[in-house]
Structure formats: structure tokens, C-alpha cells
Amino acid sequence: MRIAYDVDGNAIEQYIKSSSSSIVNTQFSRTIRYIETQSQYNEIPTSITDLLFANGFGSTLYQSLNFPLFENLTTIDFGEESFSEVATLSISGLNKLQSLIFRKNSFTFSKNSYAERTNRQLTIKNCPDLTTISFGDYSFSDYHSIQLQNLNSLISVTFGEYCFYYSNFTFSCMI
């Protein structure tokens, strides 16, 4: 059983993972997909609204990551210690995206630590409905650059300890 949470940490539902790890929440008109395996990732429907990655997912699978085909996404939740080898993450043009959650030690080689790697970059731009971004402790701790651009609805950005420790920040066209 897994409990899904909204961005404030409130439980919105409980469900038992099916073989497809996909559920439809009729109360909120949302389709949630919990990703634990590479094959589940490869089969994500473009109509998905909520994407939740398991702890440790994608740690050695990807060098870069983006989500251009998922125009209905409202939430992306990256589990703890996920996507450690991704050097470039770009989240752009997701017009319905409202919430991004990066859990502890996600997108970092330096688990519970920090080190400078000049080739790692995060870009989040052109997501007009994005209101909340949350970075867990040590997430992106070894990234060199973060760029947030054209996020007109952004209300809250929360940084845990040691996130983007060596980064240059660029916040532009935020309102």
C-alpha cells in the first residue's frame, strides 16, 4: 500500500499498487503513476497527471532527463536518492505543472554530502502554473547551476540543507 501526499504533506489517498502501478483518482480527476522499474518508466502514458518516482529509481540509467511529452502533468515527485547520475535536468513548457518535489539526496552523486561538479545543471522554465518547488536535503548538492525562468505563478521555493551548495542561481522573469 502507498499513500499519496499533496505538496503540504497531507494524505490525499491510499491505494494498493496494481501491476501497472497506475490508479485513477476520480475524486480529484487525476491519474497517478508510481514508477519503480525501467519498463514502467518506458510505458508512462502521455495523459498522466501525477508522476511519483520510487526511492533510488534511475540512479544509473540516465545522463539527462526531460519531460516534453507529458503536457497534463500537475505533479512530479522524485523519490529519495533517485537519478544520481543525471547531469542535466530540464523541465520546460509543462503548462499544467503545479508542484515539483525533489526528495533527499535526489540528483546528486554526493549522498549526504556535497562536492563541486561543474557539468551539472538544472533548468526549470516556462511552466506558467507551477506554484511550489521543494528541494530535500542534499538534493542537487553537487550541481553547479540552477536556472528558474518564466515561472509566473511560483509562490514557494523551499531548499533543504546543502542543496546546490556550489551553484550559481538565476531567477528571471518570475512575475
Regions inferred by a protein language model and the residue ranges of each:
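Acidic/polar low-complexity surface segments
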Residues: 101-121, 161-174
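Leucine-rich repeat
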Residues: 60-63, 100-103, 129-136, 154-160
